[in-house]
Amino acid sequence: MQSVDVAIVGGGMVGLAVACGLQGSGLRVAVLEQRVQEPLAANAPPQLRVSAINAASEKLLTRLGVWQDILSRRASCYHGMEVWDKDSFGHISFDDQSMGYSHLGHIVENSVIHYALWNKAHQSSDITLLAPAELQQVAWGENETFLTLKDGSMLTARLVIGADGANSWLRNKADIPLTFWDYQHHALVATIRTEEPHDAVARQVFHGEGILAFLPLSDPHLCSIVWSLSPEEAQRMQQASEDEFNRALNIAFDNRLGLCKVESARQVFPLTGRYARQFASHRLALVGDAAHTIHPLAGQGVNLGFMDAAELIAELKRLHRQGKDIGQYIYLRRYERSRKHSAALMLAGMQGFRDLFSGTNPAKKLLRDIGLKLADTLPGVKPQLIRQAMGLNDLPEWLR
């Protein structure tokens, strides 16, 4: 039976980030992942699932030694952001230079980030990648946790990290309750070709019951879109003919970049918010979507998860250096308190933002238009908003 210090269940982006961060710490780490990593084809069309990687996540990925690998594959730097309310005067825009930054963030395909982290973990002598591996049983002992895999093999760990996604099996097994709400929206994602170049600006428009984001890709005429719509409308748009879809898209987007045409399949998935009542318990810590999921309004989901990883890496290294038991809940509380606070703030902010920007009530529309206008013109507001979006208010000590 193999024994490790830390068993990470789920080899997605956040789970692998924790593993890579613990490399060289003296802790033995195993990552259990259900799927084997496929090689990335350099000439493959852009994947539909992308993330807006902010400055905080960039700092983490740089410290983990994978950022250059990501940039060398496919990542699109963006220098500006525009947000507006359709058919009204509400509008706010940001650009990096006026704020004193070289860029605001990068749009990166999730598969590119994942591949870079997987490679890094694979090259590390103190990380064992077990894939394909599926958990069948978990038993929480006083001093260690016993994990049984579907193939019958067993593993013990002093700490188990649940990085197994929004429907976390580990979270359920640990009987951690979940606050759950349905945003009553579905997200449609696709790759779009624009007539005019996107100029490395991320754009977001609020229209009636929907929110449409255009995220600039490496090709100056390609954008990845996230279109948040009612479930019925999202289904209708997914099944619509290309002409019909393009027409609706151009109307919703105010023809900002000339005629836009869909270039890929259209995927739809439901949007739900989740918040675990605990982010840790005896011999267990939750990270990423296993702990929280938010509305992908600004592509911020993975940034929140990466900051969980950054905080947990620092905490586990500190405990290990001090000779403390890394699986004791009393020691994991510090991680839990810090990340629950950050996640709650982000969830509340997103919920408030969504409530304000959904619906066509004239009074609400006027209120949000005035809010956008004031944020755009009042001194001192934009720098704060940008710092928040870049994740610079939420950096653990070791990344500052």
From Swiss-Prot:
Entry binding sites for FAD: 49-52, 297-303
The protein's enzyme class: oxidoreductase
UniProt cofactor(s): FAD
Involved pathway(s): Cofactor biosynthesis; ubiquinone biosynthesis
Gene ablation phenotype (knockout): Cells lacking this gene have a low level of coenzyme Q8 in aerobic conditions, and accumulate a compound derived from the Q biosynthetic pathway which was identified as 3-octaprenyl-4-hydroxyphenol. When grown anaerobically, they have a content of Q8 comparable with that in wild-type cells and do not accumulate 3-octaprenyl-4-hydroxyphenol. The levels of the isoprenoid naphthoquinones, demethylmenaquinone and menaquinone (MK8) are not affected in the deletion mutant under aerobic conditions.
E.C. number: 1.14.13.240
Main location: cytoplasm
Keyword flag Transmembrane: no
Location in the cell: Cytoplasm
Swiss-Prot/TrEMBL catalytic activity: 2-all-trans-octaprenylphenol + NADPH + O2 + H(+) = 3-(all-trans-octaprenyl)benzene-1,2-diol + NADP(+) + H2O; a 2-(all-trans-polyprenyl)phenol + NADPH + O2 + H(+) = a 3-(all-trans-polyprenyl)benzene-1,2-diol + NADP(+) + H2O
UniProt-listed InterPro entries: FAD-bd, FAD/NAD-bd_sf, Ubi_Hdrlase_CS, UbiH/COQ6, UbiH/COQ6_monooxygenase
GO-annotated biological processes: ubiquinone biosynthetic process
UniProt GO MF annotations: 2-polyprenylphenol 6-hydroxylase activity; FAD binding
Keywords from the UniProt entry: Cytoplasm, FAD, Flavoprotein, Monooxygenase, Oxidoreductase, Ubiquinone biosynthesis
A GO CC term assigned to this protein in UniProt: ubiquinone biosynthesis complex
PANTHER family recorded: UBIQUINONE BIOSYNTHESIS MONOOXYGENASE COQ6, MITOCHONDRIAL
Extra information: Partially complements the C5-hydroxylation defect of S.cerevisiae cells lacking COQ6.
Free-text function comment from the UniProt entry: FAD-dependent monooxygenase required for the aerobic hydroxylation of 2-octaprenylphenol to 2-octaprenyl-6-hydroxy-phenol, the first hydroxylation step in coenzyme Q (ubiquinone) biosynthesis.
Recorded family membership: Belongs to the UbiH/COQ6 family.
Assembly, per entry: Homotetramer. Component of the Ubi complex metabolon, which regroups five ubiquinone biosynthesis proteins (UbiE, UbiF, UbiG, UbiH and UbiI) and two accessory factors (UbiK and the lipid-binding protein UbiJ).
Name this protein carries in UniProt: 2-octaprenylphenol hydroxylase
Species name: Escherichia coli (strain K12)
